[in-house]
């Protein structure tokens, strides 16, 4: 073991403020890149000459490589030091962002997005760990609140900033925007944490575990992304991917439970609160993220919104979270964390049930207020569930626990990016068939609609084409209603899971 640097100790005054701001902005930068591209997918797809469903790989590739890179954080931090790793990740992330903006085609963009996701893996867990380290022990709940607020700011700024840059400048600027933020982080932390780091030691890397993780997660992600296009298990490639996925995860779990230095410390799940907290935050965030991707896509492809207006309509998702986050720390002092976590899912259930009644003629204010309620749930998600997860773990296990939890959370988000649009498209096709079957000369509604269109000067063929577009729009609206109902039921299930945890304030026996 070697350590020539001073340990990371609590800061105070202006130094603490600057350090917390820079560390929080690094987490914000990472979260921003998971949401800023959401509203830009249709534009990126069009400019690069690919279909919108192919364009969603811009989101998927980042999320899946991030999920694979996250578990390496614990090993890398012990090998190179938390501060050195953190600053290196920022440098590489900025470099990857520039490369993404310069990408001439979808293939190169996806390669750079994979690189971007992999190198920013340490930012989320290390931003948590460093914030906890620089705050005095009595104010460590404040550190988690700061981290949560920067996480909420991503959904607030991402859609608006992404929409504005896409509509008014060009889509590469959604990546170039990371450059000044990264420079500020490097300059600030280079001064605030100069000469400070944790002790380092050489550890063998779990190469087998890493390869199994890449195979298992990668094959599952490809299966989910391509399943809809290939008609799922009727296609041989999907069946082969399913077998690889099952064998990959079975081998990964078996290996990691017996490895001396596992890349994923699955033994952490023996602690009940950690298992329940991690499962709850992963499932909850996945469902939330699916909505975060699907609603802007619906607004642009079916409702005629520009990227900017789609961003404005969904930006309130994070406003309530930012406003409520400072109060969560105070509530945590005298309220059961399970109660606060339950509030997240209650808000999401209410917002999902409300969204079931969306229609194609609703205005942007209606969508915005629904987003406020959806966003309020985010304020109650992270801090209580992280507190539940870590409440019974020894301090030396916390970095690995945070890395694994963030990995599973982002893996769930990447799966949601694939499954959400696939479910939406599948239900839309079913509704299209049902609605089209009613378009007969004997159906009063279709006959009257066609007569009205003919009276407006449309030919018979033009009237039929107009009705077909209306059916397509209504089918996708009904499909979004179906997605909202399914989300509400799943949120109810996760709400029940939260209460299987022990109260963090109860003493461990």
Regions found by a protein language model. Name each.
Residues 2, 9, 184, 404, ...:
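Hydrophobic transmembrane architecture of multi-pass small-molecule transporters
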Residues 28, 60-64, 91, 145-149, ...:
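Transmembrane alpha-helical cores of Major Facilitator Superfamily
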Residues 54, 139-146, 397-404:
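Cytoplasmic loop-to-transmembrane helix junctions
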Residues 70-209, 235:
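Helix-loop-helix hairpins in multi-pass membrane proteins, especially solute transporters
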Residues 180-198, 214-226, 244-258, 495-502:
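C-terminal membrane-cytosol helix-exit motif in multi-pass small-molecule transporters
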């Amino acid at each position: 073991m070697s350590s020539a640097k001073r340990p990371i100790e609590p800061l105070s005054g202006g130094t603490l403020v600057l350090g917390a701001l820079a560390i929080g902005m690094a987490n914000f930068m990472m979260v921003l890149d998971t949401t800023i591209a959401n509203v830009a997918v249709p534009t990126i797809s069009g400019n690069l000459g690919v279909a919108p469903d192919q364009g969603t790989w811009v989101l998927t590739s980042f999320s899946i490589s991030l999920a694979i890179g996250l578990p390496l954080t614990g090993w890398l931090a012990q090998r190179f030091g938390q501060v050195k790793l953190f600053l290196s990740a920022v440098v590489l992330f900025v470099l990857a962002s520039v490369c993404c903006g310069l990408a001439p085609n979808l293939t190169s963009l996806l390669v750079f997005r994979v690189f971007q996701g992999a190198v920013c893996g340490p930012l989320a867990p290390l931003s948590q760990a460093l914030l906890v380290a620089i705050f005095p022990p009595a104010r460590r709940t404040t550190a988690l609140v700061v981290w949560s607020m920067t996480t909420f700011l991503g959904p607030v700024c991402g859609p608006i900033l992404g929409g504005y840059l896409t509509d008014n400048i060009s889509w590469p600027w959604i990546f170039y925007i990371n450059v000044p933020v990264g420079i500020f982080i490097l300059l600030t932390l280079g001064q605030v944490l100069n000469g400070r780091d944790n002790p380092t030691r050489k550890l063998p890397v779990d190469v087998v575990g890493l390869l199994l993780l890449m195979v298992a997660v990668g094959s599952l992600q490809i299966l989910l992304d391509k399943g809809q296009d290939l008609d799922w298990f009727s296609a041989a490639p999907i069946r082969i991917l399913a077998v690889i996925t099952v064998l990959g995860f079975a081998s990964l779990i078996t290996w990691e439970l017996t490895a001396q230095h596992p890349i994923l410390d699955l033994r952490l799940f023996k602690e009940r609160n950690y298992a329940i907290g991690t499962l709850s935050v992963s499932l909850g965030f996945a469902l939330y993220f699916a909505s975060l991707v699907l609603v802007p896509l619906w607004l642009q492809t079916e409702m005629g919104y520009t990227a900017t207006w789609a961003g404005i309509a969904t930006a309130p998702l994070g406003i309530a979270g930012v406003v409520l986050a400072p109060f969560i720390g105070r509530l945590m002092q005298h309220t059961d964390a399970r109660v606060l976590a339950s509030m997240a899912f209650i808000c999401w259930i209410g917002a999902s049930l409300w969204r079931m009644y969306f229609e194609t003629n609703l205005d942007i204010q209606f969508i915005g207020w629904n987003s406020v309620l959806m966003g309020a749930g985010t304020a109650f998600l992270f801090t209580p569930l992280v507190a539940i997860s870590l409440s019974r773990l020894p301090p030396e296990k916390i970095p690995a626990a945070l890395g694994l939890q963030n990995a599973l959370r982002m893996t769930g988000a990447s799966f949601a990016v694939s499954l959400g649009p696939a479910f939406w498209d599948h239900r839309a096709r079913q509704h299209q068939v049902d609605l089209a079957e009613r378009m007969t000369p004997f159906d009063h509604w279709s006959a009257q609609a066609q007569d009205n269109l003919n009276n407006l000067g449309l030919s018979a063929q033009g009237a039929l084409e107009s009705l077909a577009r209306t059916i397509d729009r209504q089918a996708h609206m009904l499909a979004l209603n179906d997605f909202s109902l399914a989300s509400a039921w799943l949120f109810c299930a996760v709400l029940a899971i939260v209460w299987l945890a022990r109260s963090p304030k109860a003493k461990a026996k």
